């Protein structure tokens, strides 16, 4: 069986997912694309030699009777509106992170999904499908290192665009750690606080780096370094300290060179390459389940809502300098 999909938003990640769905993932055919920038979607179709309908308005794509699944890779601000429209048309949704830029918009998606009476949305928190993170979770869940006590994470990018601002370090960067730590530890957050260390002299458009401390409901402390202009590469790190030992996210495999009294390995620069397998696996799982008549099993709309509420608290802490409470309602039975 092959499901027919439409992609809304053919920018950097949308174009990459177009290639992925056309050339790597089985059980899906891309039949329509949409982008507000004239010519962008068609250029991507031409680049990958794909034949599909090219729409300017996402409503037209959603209303296309051939489209069964809507992939949302548009601007973050558009995610909620597109998701709600797709759900109102009773179509399955794969939405890149974040689900929405506000908790209120996430709630709109949750309400639209629940009206259909079944899970129809998966959020693109791809780290849950990364082999290293899966190994880390298996170690934690097995009890091998005992109860987790504290976690240290690092999310570094070599550079970012001038338009990238201070809150985006939370909404677009830390959002991955917010979700993956919640998943690894199977806990919600209680409080958050954002610190601004010494400012990088190479950055003038935002506060960079940032240090985020999150406390879970059981008291686990999580410290994440966010540095989006570190210069040297794309560097993701996570280690979990437990009562009996420590588990660490494996580094990306890279051939080592011994030469001229030096030992060196490469560090990736492109985030798409770091998680290329995770992206492939998450989409294959999504379409395998839908083709088998099963609901999506990946990150839910509720996970997207939890991440948004936590991110809102972090941004508030950026502004106040205080520890902020993460006010999260009880999880609906629909998502249990």
Curated annotation (Swiss-Prot):
InterPro entries: Gfo-Idh-MocA_inositol_DH (IPR050424), Gfo/Idh/MocA-like_OxRdtase_C (IPR004104), Gfo/Idh/MocA-like_OxRdtase_N (IPR000683), MI/DCI_dehydrogenase (IPR023794), NAD(P)-bd_dom_sf (IPR036291). Keywords: NAD, Oxidoreductase. The keyword Kinase does not apply. Gene3D superfamilies: Dihydrodipicolinate Reductase, domain 2, NAD(P)-binding Rossmann-like Domain. The keyword Oxidoreductase applies. One of its GO terms (biological process) is inositol catabolic process. It comes from the Bacteria. Its EC number is 1.1.1.18. It catalyses: myo-inositol + NAD(+) = scyllo-inosose + NADH + H(+). Pfam families: GFO_IDH_MocA, GFO_IDH_MocA_C. GO terms for molecular function: inositol 2-dehydrogenase (NAD+) activity; nucleotide binding. Involved in the oxidation of myo-inositol (MI) to 2-keto-myo-inositol (2KMI or 2-inosose). Homotetramer. Belongs to the Gfo/Idh/MocA family. This is Inositol 2-dehydrogenase. The lineage of its organism: Bacteria, Pseudomonadati, Pseudomonadota, Gammaproteobacteria, Enterobacterales.
